[in-house]
């Protein structure tokens, strides 16, 4: 996100993650609450979910724009809600056809606009 910069990107990502927690909920099957980290990436991935530690990783600098940043937050948060350790890796098909990936992509489409609208309405500095 060359144009936006680190501080605003990290701030928006934290707001998106809080929105996800409030609106999408948390996985009650986990022994501990989910956490998230917004950090600089080291390859081309925009985000990741670690099911063992129940941690969402957002690589802010790998996202092209605010839309992709928010989509990544929603996508990875969706994985936090899914049975990743027990079912995700048992799917024999390709990554793109995995039903858990498909659900995460559907949630990106479904919730990105709503999340971004909420962030802009509650943070006037964004629209300046």
Model-derived features: positions:
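Acidic/histidine-rich, surface-exposed loop or edge segments in extracytoplasmic proteins
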Residues: 1-4
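Catalytic zinc-binding patch centered on the HExxH motif and its immediate surroundings
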Residues: 35-57, 64-67
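Short pre-active-site segment immediately N-terminal to the catalytic Zn-binding motif
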Residues: 56-73, 94-96
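Post-HExxH zinc-binding segment in Zn-dependent metallohydrolases
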Residues: 92-124
